[in-house]
A protein has these predicted regions:
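Active-site cores that bind ATP or allylic diphosphates and position pyrophosphate for catalysis
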Residues: 1-348
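Glycine-rich phosphate-binding loop of ATP-dependent small-molecule kinases
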Residues: 17, 29, 139, 143, ...
Length: 529
């Protein structure tokens, strides 16, 4: 919404109609032929769509209820989102974050039409670093910058990025705009507060008056080649003449089988076909690697034969940060490393969540209570138990046991657990949590904030039914209780559980001890220094 209102998405002046949407998906062009590679749509629930008709208006508000704009509805339709995913992302694999967002977290109805802005979107963070396209172009004019090369990033910048951007600016004799995305990025990315502090720590390493930092409120789609073209359009709207495009630009990496969603230089190839039409010049770069003998970064295709090189992938860096490990000095600058360390303490100081899942009577609550006591005995962190029955009583008393309501309940537990984890505490959650998709949503919610482990209490149904301390299975078999997991409702056993326990032959004490040992192995509990 913000970029539609401030001109960042020019020539768009509203959300796409079905004609523009279909044309963009099929041909990367609006219905009038203008190059545009990514659908910009407003998705709404069925209930909202039923109250709206073409020619009507829809108020668009922020999270606090402030009306930011009015949409004049010109088109209302139900898109084929599978077809959209295949056209835009080249896949329907939900492991692609853009596809997962589109297929699983997008409402079924799209509304297109012209926007009437009422007031700008409010931001309270880094106000001095946020510029509209008009403001940024005016700043360039005031500085006398006639050629500006933009650098798009969603990650902290390190030595390789600094060398790459310096080379790019020198190559085309342009000033440098570091233009990081601070909207939605890829799950697991470093939060934007930490990233901005890292950019600010890096900025003094550029020659004076040659580089500036501005934040872009863009939600990335991780769309690879198409997204590179989109980024070029957006940067042109912000007054830039060039765009750095590196290896796997805006790509999500690989799927769980190790297959890359896009080729390493697909984005460069697609943008090169359109840069003349766009009026933005691409500055292509290959992977930068560290050459030990020269203590410097060099494009991989320029490394002299026989020279030893070092490289740290984004995945390896995230793993080091998650475990609180030191980032090597050849990889980043000390000031950047300090900022990352502030936001990524060692694992034994991080918060974490244990999400128990299993059938009623499997032993979840008993183990969770024993574990709670053991963790409190160890000290060092605040520990909270979110037991299924207690949550139903205090947080979800109005909910039933339909799939929709079960998922809402688990998301509520996940939200509370995420806040506990973010603030360095331990959340021990013991619902039934029968459905895999919502467990994955909770994982995605918490993993960027700290540790997350699924504990599958895999006690067989016949054992749970034999115990039946509350008489629930007997009532379910008799039809007195409807929608009972394991009898009339399904239970989807997790395939991604970090810990699997069967209490058929284990006591609750023994099971809790297994979990403690796993936490010790993973570094979440440690002896006193």
């Amino acid at each position: 919404l913000e970029l539609l209102l401030n001109g960042g998405f020019s020539p768009l002046t509203g959300f796409m109609t079905s004609a523009d949407h279909g044309s963009v998906c099929a041909d990367m062009r609006l219905a009038d032929g203008t190059l545009w590679p990514i659908p910009i749509t407003l998705d709404v629930p069925e209930a909202t769509a039923e109250k709206l008709s073409t020619g009507g208006t829809l108020a668009l508000r922020d999270d606090e209820g402030v009306m930011l704009a009015v949409l004049h509805a010109e088109d209302i339709w139900r898109p084929d989102r599978e077809a959209e995913a295949q056209a835009v992302f080249g896949t329907t694999n939900r492991e692609h974050p853009g596809v997962g967002q589109l297929l699983d977290r997008t409402e079924p109805v799209y509304v297109g039409g012209r926007l009437e802005g009422l007031q700008p979107v409010s931001h309270y963070d880094y106000k001095e670093l946020r510029h509209t396209p008009t403001e940024l172009r005016a700043a360039f004019t005031k500085l006398g910058w006639t050629k500006v090369v933009a650098f798009q990033t969603r990650n902290p910048m390190h030595r390789a990025h600094q060398e790459l951007t310096l080379r790019a600016a020198k190559e085309v004799e342009a000033n440098l705009l570091i233009h990081p995305v601070v909207g939605m990025t890829k799950p697991g990315d470093v939060d934007h507060y930490t990233r901005v502090r890292c950019y600010q720590a890096l900025l003094p390493r550029y020659p004076q008056k040659t580089a500036m930092l501005s934040l872009l409120p863009l939600a990335m789609r991780m769309g690879g080649p198409r997204e590179a073209v989109w980024h070029a359009i957006i940067r042109k709207n912000h007054g830039c003449t060039h765009l750095v495009v590196g290896r796997d630009h805006a790509g999500p990496g690989s799927d769980s089988n190790g297959n890359a969603f896009y080729g390493p230089y697909d984005a460069q190839e697609l943008l090169s076909k359109h840069e003349a039409e766009l009026g933005v010049t691409m500055v292509p770069f290959k992977l930068m690697v560290f050459v030990e003998e020269t203590d410097s970064y060099t494009p991989i295709d320029e490394v002299p034969e026989g020279k030893r090189t070092l490289n740290l992938s984004g995945t390896e860096l995230r793993d080091r940060l998650a475990k609180g490990k030191e980032v090597p000095s050849w990889f980043t600058f000390p000031t950047v490393a300090e900022e990352l360390a502030r936001s990524h303490p060692p694992r034994h100081e991080q918060g974490f969540t244990l999400l128990f899942t299993g059938l009623s009577g499997s032993g979840k609550s008993t183990i969770a209570n024993v574990l709670l006591v053991k963790l409190l005995e160890m000290g060092g962190r605040a520990v909270t138990l979110l037991d299924g029955d207690l949550v139903r009583k205090n947080l979800s008393s109005e909910l039933g046991f339909s799939r929709e309501h079960r998922d809402i309940n688990i998301r509520r537990i996940g939200y509370v657990a995420s806040e506990i984890t973010k603030n360095g505490g331990v959340a021990v959650c013991a619902p039934i949590a029968p459905f895999d998709s919502v467990r994955k949503q909770v994982r995605a919610m918490i993993e960027p904030l700290g540790g997350f482990m699924v504990v599958h209490v895999a006690t067989p149904l016949e054992v749970c039914e034999r115990r039946d301390r509350k008489g629930l299975y007997a009532k379910a078999r008799a039809g007195i209780i409807k929608e009972f997991t394991g009898i009339s409702d399904p239970y989807e056993a997790p395939e991604d559980a970090e810990i699997v326990i069967d209490t058929t032959t284990l006591t609750a004490e023994e099971a809790a001890q297994q979990i403690i040992l796993h936490l010790e192995k993973e570094g979440y509990v440690a002896g006193k220094a």
